[in-house]
From Swiss-Prot:
Compartments where found: Membrane
Topology of the protein relative to the lipid bilayer: Single-pass type I membrane protein
UniProt protein name: Membrane protein FAM174A
Stretches that traverse the bilayer: 124-144
Regions of this protein lying in the Extracellular compartment: 32-123
Keyword flag Membrane: yes
Primary location: membrane
Species for this entry: Mus musculus (Mouse)
Chain residue ranges for the region called Disordered: 37-119, 167-190
Family per record: Belongs to the FAM174 family.
């Protein structure tokens, strides 16, 4: 069954996928309110009540002060320059880090996006890859279809030429040539 003129095979399936891919971008701007988006936002909001910090795993980081272990793990440049020989310097820094970490969940200072929230550049890259793949599929399908048509034309190539437009003119008679060709088929310009 032939497809309608305005709708090709791969585009018919890729259009809904493209719309689904753009839904998170639209919902972030407030253009598409949905129950799923609201539920996700409610589950991400911090719950009221006391927050407890998880204990440190046993190992080399347990012997170090909490602030130094976190900065060493994060690879912060200020971690090497901290002076632990001054008695009050380490405890003051630890106290400040503890106070700053109380408001955040898990006690971490760095704000990292959750796996569900994709940065805008990653969304743009995903859309670009999907559109490029759709264009690639379109041209591959188009090339395959064109080759099928060309094979049919080549198979009946002799019948396809227009005989009415062909002129048969006699060749000049040369005694030197042993050519047995009597007529030359010339195609006039169309």
């Amino acid at each position: 069954m032939p497809t309608p003129r305005g709708c090709s095979g791969p585009c018919h399936f890729l259009a809904p996928a493209f719309v689904l891919l753009l839904l998170p971008a639209l919902s972030g701007s407030g253009a598409v309110p949905s129950m799923v988006v609201r539920e996700v936002q409610e589950s991400k909001s911090p719950k009221p009540g006391p927050h407890t910090l998880s204990p440190l795993p046993p190992g080399p980081t347990a012997a170090q002060p909490r602030g130094q272990a976190q900065s060493d793990a994060a690879g912060l440049p200020g971690a090497e320059s901290r002076n632990d020989s001054i008695p009050g310097a380490g405890s003051e820094a630890d106290g400040l880090e503890g106070k700053a970490g109380e408001g955040s969940q898990g006690g971490s200072l760095a704000v990292s996006p959750s796996p569900g929230d994709k940065p805008m550049t990653q969304r743009a890259l995903t859309v670009l890859v999907v559109v490029s793949a759709a264009v690639l599929v379109y041209f591959v399908v188009r090339t395959v279809r064109m080759r099928r048509r060309n094979r049919k034309t080549r198979r009946y190539g002799v019948l396809d030429t227009n005989i009415e437009n062909m002129e048969l003119t006699p060749l000049e008679q040369d005694d030197e040539d042993d050519d047995n060709t009597l007529f030359d088929a010339n195609h006039p310009r169309r």
